[in-house]
């Protein structure tokens, strides 16, 4: 490889480094934005959970179409809907791969309809022949409460109409700076699982809510519970979308930071090689001049 080739390669790597560095900075900004969004929604979401938790703990037996019925024989051929949240783009490490892999393991041979948020997951599952809702077209970028409300309404409609017996979510959970793919059944609610989620949220908020155990719910605890579940689901889906959004950009930050570091190392090695060749060339010229002068 000559000096000219090395110089061109150094220039090319520097251009790539500019791109990876810019992508890192953009993802860092979006990651911080997502963390702020999550912190703002948590208090409201926590209060809705607190009321539901109180109804379940202190009002006796609650009957609701949204609660799992333990005494009813389990259906053999359940119709399941899976809300799968991936990214719209790649270049974010194993983020998309991990969500897709967990989804495949969960679905297996189930009779399932997939509602996929994010272009990467949508393209993959359509290509592999899964039953993907083609009209469910939502981006993973910049999640909003209105978007979460739309998705919650679609899922509730299918559940209430009997088109779905179970609704699941597969997404990447963000806790601090750690990530893990989580599979969660949204409906029907499992009381034990719901209490566990409520306990996790209680740890995450600063201001705890205490409800009088003698609280009377009108017209009835069951009706109040049924009225609150859609709000709970909207808050939960918003939390899922924001955590996935934060996870995607954190993964991209890590990937782009690694790519930038690799580019720096390559530039350093190529520059060293270029200087060696340049030095050798200069030395050769000096030798030729001295040799010529002595003749």
From Swiss-Prot:
Coarse class of the protein's main subcellular location: membrane
Record-level Gene Ontology MF annotations: ATP binding; proton-transporting ATP synthase activity, rotational mechanism
Disulphide connectivity of cysteines: none
Subcellular location per the Swiss-Prot or TrEMBL entry: Cell membrane
Keyword Cytoplasm in annotation: no
Family stated for the protein in its record: Belongs to the ATPase gamma chain family.
Protein name as catalogued: ATP synthase gamma chain
Gene: atpG
């Amino acid at each position: 490889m000559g000096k000219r080739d090395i110089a061109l390669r150094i220039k090319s790597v520097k251009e790539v480094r500019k791109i990876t560095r810019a992508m890192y900075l953009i993802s860092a900004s979006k990651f911080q934005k997502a963390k702020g969004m999550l912190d703002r929604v948590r208090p409201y979401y926590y209060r809705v959970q607190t009321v539901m938790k109180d109804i379940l703990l202190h009002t006796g037996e609650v009957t609701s179409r949204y609660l799992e019925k333990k005494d009813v024989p389990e259906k053999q051929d359940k119709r399941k809907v899976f809300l799968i949240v991936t990214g719209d783009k790649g270049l974010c490490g194993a983020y998309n791969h991990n969500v897709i892999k967990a989804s495949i393991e969960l679905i297996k041979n189930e009779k399932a309809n997939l509602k996929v948020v994010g272009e990467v997951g949508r393209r993959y599952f359509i290509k592999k022949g899964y039953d993907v809702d083609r009209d469910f077209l939502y981006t993973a970028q910049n999640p909003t409460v209105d978007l979460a409300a739309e998705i919650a309404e679609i899922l509730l409609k299918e559940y209430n109409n009997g088109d779905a017996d179970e609704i699941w979510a597969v997404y990447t959970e963000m806790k601090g700076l750690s990530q893990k793919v989580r599979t969660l059944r949204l409906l029907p609610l499992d009381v034990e699982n719901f209490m566990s989620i409520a306990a996790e949220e209680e740890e995450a908020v600063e201001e705890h809510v205490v409800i009088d155990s003698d609280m009377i719910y009108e017209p009835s605890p069951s009706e109040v519970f049924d009225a609150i579940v859609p709000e709970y689901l909207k808050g939960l889906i918003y939390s899922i979308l924001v955590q996935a959004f934060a996870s995607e950009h954190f993964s991209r930050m890590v990937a782009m930071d690694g790519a930038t570091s690799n580019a720096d190392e390559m530039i350093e090695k190529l520059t060293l090689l270029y200087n060696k060749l340049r030095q050798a060339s200069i030395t050769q010229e000096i030798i030729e001049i001295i040799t010529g002068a002595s003749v």
